[in-house]
């Protein structure tokens, strides 16, 4: 049992003792309401915490569940075992319906769109009187009834709600396996890297949105059965603000964060009510202090296991590279062009990289080198031309599919989430990998000289080690083609040599390596061929010596035709 699991169990036991021994009927009512909010917050953590999207629709999903229960229960006499799953399905169905247009939006546009959806549902609830009861809502919602047992109030209802909280927590634990948490973290913190690892960010966000809606619908259904009345307030913005505040104060991640936030914010108004007209001020001050001193939630202040510190020993490349290379037929880039507005980034570029080759790409800043890497990896789509991986046309394929088919890459600036450890980062590359016989994480770490850093958070690593981690992550998926975008930038001579040894071993094992860099001293002894780009055009593609002797290359790259 982990320390946090023990804390959750202790919190549950303390709640049970409090309710049984000290709790009045009103206290039991508050604890019941807290349980409803825990479920609501657990759902909101999927989209707001793990997916990193500020959704303002969680209150709307809560309202959909509440109104569905109210209509079915009060109007048609349906019992809990019917209303509960239908409410969940309707909330999730509504989320699925709006997800396609809404999830394409980013940042504040997504927040505004979800807020608009919430307000639309509120208008429908207020004005569709024959169905929703209008401003008066729907009274007479039946209590929870299970197999002839009616749970109206008190300890039986409290116990039932918290049993459902336990079930919701179990579902969260089942959905958030370590590999999926890593995928969410990469998508949220380094969105550029996610598709390059085969992670379908759109599908992951869709899953988070649906789960948040389903939990919201479940919480709304429970609220309707325990409150016995549904009013437009259940669709009001106040529910959304309450949910958001609970999540921020308690913590965006984890069951314990949801427990802390829901329990604290449900009871705070009661604890401060003796202050009469000043209690809202006191609550506001407490929340402000919490956000300032615990920006990641109160749960982040609790002790947690610390990973081992970074070793002071210099890493050394070791091991055989054969296990990191998938059989392939090479990469062909045929006449691709790409423009951004009036800027021609690539102009009829053709390039071939065969297994066992290291093809270097040089060129001045703005020549189109990174655009070429982006077009090959699917991060951008070429306007014309053809790109083939073996016999497969990948010209317009999504980046996450291209990664799964065998093209791995690194970035000019290492794209590594600070909170994940080195081993978690490397393991994340294998979440969606389809290649058989993947190397073990330990094997990849050993080959890249990173084994001593396996438990170190990436945010604490030096720049040179971060470069190495990116390469290790790329190799863990066992690609056919490896694209390295300026891997030597900012490295010492010794670190550059180690990267070079690694590239040579990979090429000797049959990998096709595309090496983009400005450092001629690094590229010349490594590359099988060296191509030079100028203003999006390949002006030379030959052996390194012949390319560097080309007058056009000298003029474009060095600023002089003769040296």
Task: Describe each model-derived feature in a short phrase.
Residues 482-486:
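Catalytic Walker B motif of ABC-type/P-loop ATPase nucleotide-binding domains
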Residues 1-314:
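Transmembrane alpha-helices and adjacent helix-loop boundaries
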Residues 438-456, 501-504:
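Conserved ABC ATPase "signature" region
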Residues 523-525:
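A short, surface-exposed alpha-helical micro-motif characterized by mixed small hydrophobic
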Residues 362-364:
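The feature captures the beta-strand-to-loop junction immediately N-terminal to the Walker
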Residues 377:
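Helix-to-loop junction immediately C-terminal to a conserved catalytic motif
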């Amino acid at each position: 049992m982990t320390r946090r699991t023990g804390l959750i169990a202790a919190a549950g036991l303390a709640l049970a003792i409090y309710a049984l021994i000290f709790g009045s009927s009103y206290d039991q009512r508050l604890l019941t309401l807290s349980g409803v909010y825990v479920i609501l917050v657990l759902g909101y953590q999927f989209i707001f915490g793990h997916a990193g999207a500020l959704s303002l629709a969680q209150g709307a999903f809560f309202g959909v569940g509440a109104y569905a229960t109210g209509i079915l229960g009060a109007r048609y006499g349906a019992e809990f075992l019917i209303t509960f799953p239908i409410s969940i399905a309707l909330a999730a169905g509504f989320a699925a319906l709006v997800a396609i247009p809404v999830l394409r939006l980013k940042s504040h546009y997504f927040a505004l769109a979800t807020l608009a959806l919430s307000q639309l549902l509120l208008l429908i609830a207020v004005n569709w009187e024959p169905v929703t009861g209008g401003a008066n809502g729907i009274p007479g919602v039946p209590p929870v009834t299970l197999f002839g047992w009616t749970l109206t109030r008190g300890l039986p209802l409290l116990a039932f709600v918290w049993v459902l909280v336990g079930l919701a927590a179990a579902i969260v634990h089942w959905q958030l396996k370590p590999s999926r948490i890593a995928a969410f973290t990469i998508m949220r913190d380094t969105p550029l890297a996610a598709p390059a690892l085969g992670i379908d960010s759109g599908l992951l966000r869709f899953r988070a949105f649906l789960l948040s809606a389903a939990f919201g619908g479940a919480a709304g259904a429970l609220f309707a059965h325990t409150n016995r009345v549904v009013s437009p307030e259940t669709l009001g913005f106040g529910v959304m603000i309450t949910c958001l505040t609970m999540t921020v104060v308690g913590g965006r991640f984890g069951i314990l964060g949801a427990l802390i936030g829901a329990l604290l914010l449900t009871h705070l108004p009661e604890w401060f009510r003796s202050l009469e007209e000043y209690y809202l001020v006191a609550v506001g001050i407490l929340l402000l202090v919490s956000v300032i001193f615990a920006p990641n939630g109160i749960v982040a202040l609790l002790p947690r296991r610390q990973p081992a510190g970074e070793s002071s020993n210099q890493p050394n490349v070791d091991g055989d590279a054969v296990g990191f290379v998938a059989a392939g037929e090479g990469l062909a880039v045929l006449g691709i062009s790409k423009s951004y507005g009036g800027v021609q980034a690539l102009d009829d570029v053709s390039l071939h990289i065969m297994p066992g080759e290291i093809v270097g790409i040089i060129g001045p800043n703005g020549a189109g080198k990174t655009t070429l890497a982006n077009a090959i990896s699917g991060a951008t789509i070429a306007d014309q031309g053809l790109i083939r991986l073996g016999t497969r046309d990948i010209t317009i394929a999504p980046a996450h599919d291209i990664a799964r088919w065998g093209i791995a890459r690194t970035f000019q600036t290492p794209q590594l989430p600070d909170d994940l450890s080195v081993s978690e980062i490397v393991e994340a590359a294998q979440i969606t990998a389809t290649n058989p016989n993947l190397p073990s994480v330990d094997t990849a770490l050993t080959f890249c000289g990173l084994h001593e850093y396996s438990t170190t958070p990436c945010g604490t690593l030096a720049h040179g080690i971060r470069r190495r981690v990116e390469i290790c992550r790329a190799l863990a998926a066992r690609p056919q083609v490896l694209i390295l975008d300026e891997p030597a930038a900012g490295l010492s001579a010794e670190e550059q040599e180690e990267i070079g040894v690694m590239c040579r071993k990979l090429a000797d094992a049959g990998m096709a390596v595309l090496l983009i860099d400005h450092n001629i001293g690094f590229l010349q002894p490594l590359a099988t061929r060296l191509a030079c780009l100028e203003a999006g055009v390949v002006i030379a593609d030959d052996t390194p010596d012949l390319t560097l002797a080309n007058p056009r290359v000298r003029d474009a790259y060095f600023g002089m035709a003769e040296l």
